[in-house]
Regions:
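A generic local structural motif
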Residues: 76-80, 110-111, 218-219
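Short, well-ordered beta-strand elements
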Residues: 90-93
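C-terminal cap of thioredoxin/glutaredoxin-like
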Residues: 2-39, 43, 48-49, 55-56, ...
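Ser/Thr/Pro/Gly-rich low-complexity linker/stalk segments immediately outside membranes or between
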Residues: 58-73
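Structural alpha/beta surface segment adjacent to cysteine/selenocysteine redox centers
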Residues: 97, 103-181
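A short beta-strand-turn-helix
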Residues: 72-88
Length: 254
C-alpha cells in the first residue's frame, strides 16, 4: 500500500511539473537583442557617412543665393556699382570669373553683401578682370565673361547673371563657356537680343585688359608686391577677408 501511495504522488507531481520549452534556447533573447542593436548601429553609421559624403562633395557653386536682390545697379566704363550711391560704406571687389577663390568668396558672402546692399548700408564696385585669360583653351574666357557681366547691367539681369557666372564656372584648363553659352544664360534670365549682341561683340575687351593692368600695378591692392583675385578693398586699400565677420567689421567701422 505504501508503494501505491508513492506511485500516486509521483503521477501527481509529473502532472503539474512545468515542461521544458522546446522553442527557446537559454540566452537566445540576449542574442536577439544584440543582433537588433548591431543592425541599428550599422544603419546609423551608413546614414552618417552618406551625409558626410554629400556635404564634402557638394560643388561650391551649387549653393544658391537665398537673399533676393532689390538694390540698384549701374555701370561706369568697366566698373559695375551695386547699391545706393549714398551708402555710407564703399567696398571694391576685384574678381575674375575663372578664379575658383573668387567663386568661393561669392558663395560665402553673397547673402551678407546682398542684405547690406538691399538695406542701403553699403555700395560695392565690382571690377571684373582678366588675369586668368591664358588659363583656358583657347585663351580669353575671363575677358569674355567679364564683358558679358557688363552687358548684363543694361539688360537688367546683373545680380542673377553675376551669380550664375560663378555657379557655372568652368575649370581652369578647360575651353570655358562660349559666347553662345554666355548669351543663353542671359536669355534664360530674361535678357533680350541686345544682350546677345553685346556678349558676342565682346566690345569691352580692351578696356577690361587696361583695367586689369591698372589694378595689378596698384601697390595698395598688392600683398608682398603681388596682385591676385579676389582682392577686396575698403577706402582704396586691400583688406583681409579671411575672418568670417569681416563684413560686419567693415559696416561697424562705417
Amino acid at each position: 500500500m505504501g508503494g501505491a501511495s508513492r506511485n500516486e504522488r509521483r503521477r501527481r507531481q509529473e502532472a503539474v511539473a512545468p515542461r521544458p520549452s522546446v522553442d527557446r534556447v537559454p540566452g537566445s533573447g540576449r542574442k536577439d537583442n544584440r543582433v537588433k542593436v548591431g543592425i541599428l548601429v550599422a544603419v546609423v553609421i551608413v546614414v552618417v557617412f552618406a551625409t558626410i559624403f554629400v556635404v564634402l562633395n557638394r560643388p561650391w557653386g551649387s549653393s544658391t543665393q537665398a537673399t533676393a536682390a532689390s538694390y540698384p545697379v549701374a555701370v561706369d566704363g568697366v566698373v559695375v556699382t551695386a547699391g545706393q550711391a549714398s551708402a555710407p560704406v564703399t567696398i571694391d571687389v576685384y574678381e575674375d570669373f575663372l578664379c575658383p577663390f573668387c567663386e568661393r568668396f561669392e558663395t560665402r558672402n553673397a547673402d551678407g553683401l546682398t542684405a547690406a546692399l538691399n538695406e542701403g548700408k553699403v555700395k560695392v564696385n565690382y571690377h571684373a578682370l582678366n588675369i586668368l585669360d591664358a588659363r583656358t583653351t583657347p585663351p580669353g574666357y575671363s575677358t569674355l565673361a567679364a564683358n558679358a557681366a557688363l552687358c548684363a547691367v543694361p539688360a537688367g539681369i546683373w545680380p542673377a547673371y553675376h551669380a550664375r557666372l560663378f555657379a557655372e564656372q568652368p575649370a581652369e584648363g578647360s575651353a570655358g563657356l562660349t559666347a553662345a553659352q554666355l548669351s543663353a544664360i542671359g536669355t534664360s534670365l530674361g535678357a533680350g537680343p541686345a544682350f546677345t549682341q553685346c556678349v558676342e561683340g565682346n566690345g569691352n575687351a580692351a578696356a577690361i585688359t587696361a583695367a586689369t593692368a591698372a589694378a595689378s600695378a596698384n601697390p595698395e591692392l598688392q600683398t608682398d608686391g603681388q596682385f591676385g583675385t579676389p582682392t577686396i578693398a575698403v577706402g582704396g586699400r586691400k583688406i583681409d577677408v579671411s575672418d568670417s565677420d569681416w563684413l560686419q567689421t567693415v559696416l561697424a567701422a562705417g
